[in-house]
Amino acid sequence: MDLIHTFLNLIAPPFTFFFLLFFLPPFQIFKFFLSILGTLFSEDVAGKVVVITGASSGIGESLAYEYAKRGACLVLAARRERSLQEVAERARDLGSPDVVVVRADVSKAEDCRKVVDQTMNRFGRLDHLVNNAGIMSVSMLEEVEDITGYRETMDINFWGYVYMTRFAAPYLRNSRGRIVVLSSSSSWMPTPRMSFYNASKAAISQFFETLRVEFGPDIGITLVTPGFIESELTQGKFYNAGERVIDQDMRDVQVSTTPILRVESAARSIVRSAIRGERYVTEPAWFRVTYWWKLFCPEVMEWVFRLMYLASPGEPEKETFGKKVLDYTGVKSLLYPETVQVPEPKND
């Protein structure tokens, strides 16, 4: 057995290198032509049924408006019913023929089942499931006193997606529908204080990569890995040990000098990619390069993140190099939309 592994250790790397050297160029050309076909023959979602979780604000809200403009029927789910009603009203004005609001906590399996059941009772079909609900926790691991208080991050960011997908899968298979998964570039980026959030996004990315194989061509999956997008998270809304915290100084520490993309632009790109049948979408597009840095130069990425996101010894936690650049140069007004600098995110 050891001899087999020794042989593979010697043969597998050079074989893979030369295989990719000759295979990748024609394969990329093939994918380019597929993308053209996807653009020419995009899915028409008019009259189709789209379920969106976390639709009361941020990316979920803007995704609802984008689907509404295309004439889709919507089922909007979130914990804040009043905000959902406001989103639903605007979605109707934008062109959605029918909008259903369901108050639900996706961390609870029974609530996720309720969302799917009400969808089928109302429309009798389900075409797109947009798994979007999520929260962000921010804390250094060694500063966490009760680590069980961070279970909510995984309950919502991971299990909420699992529950919704499990209950919706039979109906999506019948309609040969699509799942749009709001993961994050944090699934590969080692941002300090975001270990729980990063882990939840890495878990969900791999979960849906596996489901691609299990579902095959019956259910399409578009995996979205955005950078920093205009939302309540980039307004400074965090969850620490189960408690909601509004901390824009910590937001400045965590976002640092990274430009924040306007949510309308991100939502347009996500829906456009979904109806084209694309497997992956990263917004803003330039954020894809961070994956290659992580893949080929992980040591460099770790050094940069320590420099930008961690304070020097003896300095306050929030006095990081990245935040100092924001404070002393005035570039914050160029990098952050005005909407993320409001003192209080939307709340019911």
UniProtKB/Swiss-Prot annotation:
Residues at which substrate binds: 184
Major enzyme class: oxidoreductase
InterPro entries, alphabetized: NAD(P)-bd_dom_sf, Sc_DH/Rdtase_CS, SDR_fam
Alphabetical keyword list: Lipid droplet, Membrane, NADP, Oxidoreductase, Signal-anchor, Transmembrane, Transmembrane helix
Biological function: Has dehydrogenase activity against corticosterone (11 beta-hydroxysteroid) and estradiol (17 beta-hydroxysteroid), with higher activity against estradiol. Possesses higher dehydrogenase activity with NADP(+) than NAD(+) regardless of the sterol substrate. May be involved in signal transduction regulated by various sterols.
PANTHER family, sorted: 11-BETA-HYDROXYSTEROID DEHYDROGENASE 1A-RELATED, RETINOL DEHYDROGENASE-RELATED
Protein name: 11-beta-hydroxysteroid dehydrogenase A
Native organism: Sesamum indicum
Phylogenetic placement of the source organism: Eukaryota, Viridiplantae, Streptophyta, Embryophyta, Tracheophyta
Gene: SOP2
